[in-house]
Amino acid sequence: MTHDLTEPPGTNPNTFLDFPLQTDLDDLDADIAILGIQFGMPYESTSIPNDQSNAPNAIRQASSETDIAYTRNHFDWDLGGQLLDGRDIKVVDCGNVTTDKADHKEHYRRAERAARKIFSANSTLIALGGDHGVPIPVMRALEVFDVPVTLVHVDAHLDWRHEVNGEREGYSSPIRRAAEMPWIDKIVQIGMRGIGSARDGEVQDAINYGAEIIDTYEMHEIGMAEVLRRIPNGGPYYLTIDADGIDPTIMPAVMAQTPGGLDWMQVRQFVHGLISKGRVLGMDLVEIAPGRDVGNITMVHAERLICNFIGAAVRAGYYEG
């Protein structure tokens, strides 16, 4: 039994869009599984818990019962119909990975085990972070597919640091760690801008690896259709989205607000376009700091992003046959 891997999230509502709660991952039967992973690996003992650890529950609790009823049952112009398109699609919320604030490595081990069980059940994983260390155990779990996976990364920052303060698995290092995983093949990085933890050496390391880096200036110049064209066709893909990759006018609740990110129309086009190119095995949305939100605007766009991902996957025929 693996009930110890996850625990029920907060209350009112306690699951994303009031989808059924399923914390027994040994008996998982779902097309789409939502999983909260609250904690990355800290660089300092005082940095855990951080505000990002509140995001999984904040995203779940941002919608009222009325909002949920409309979102699940009414016509959605983003999708051209109801969220699940009237199809027999099973979405579950697996709760949050059980935390052990005294043993952060154990938290990562639990996150990886949970993700492996979700992937092994042929469920599409939607992980809610947490800071950007969270995808590291999830990407390790992609090993279960035994195929090369294209990693698609949206972020203001490159995330290629080997270590910070001696820690190799924190929020500045997920793409470096991914590049070391034999099952990660092509890496496409979108939206880089401003100043982050990367130095000249990390940028060169990414280039030497062969990462396709499309900074925000090139992205806006060439357009999202060309960005999508540069991503290899067919998949499979794993998508990791740092909220600061999206423009702070629509996602202000981040720790590193940097102007010039993806706007909503680009986000929607990107999500639908990637899903139509091939199978997206899973995605994560990380680095939301709820305490910095303005008028709930970040939560609104987070919910819209996730719903567009779900609705696009349904319409792409992911769960037929």
Question: What residue ranges belong to the model's regions?
Answer:
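Conserved alpha-helical scaffold segments that buttress catalytic/binding sites
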Residues: 2-321
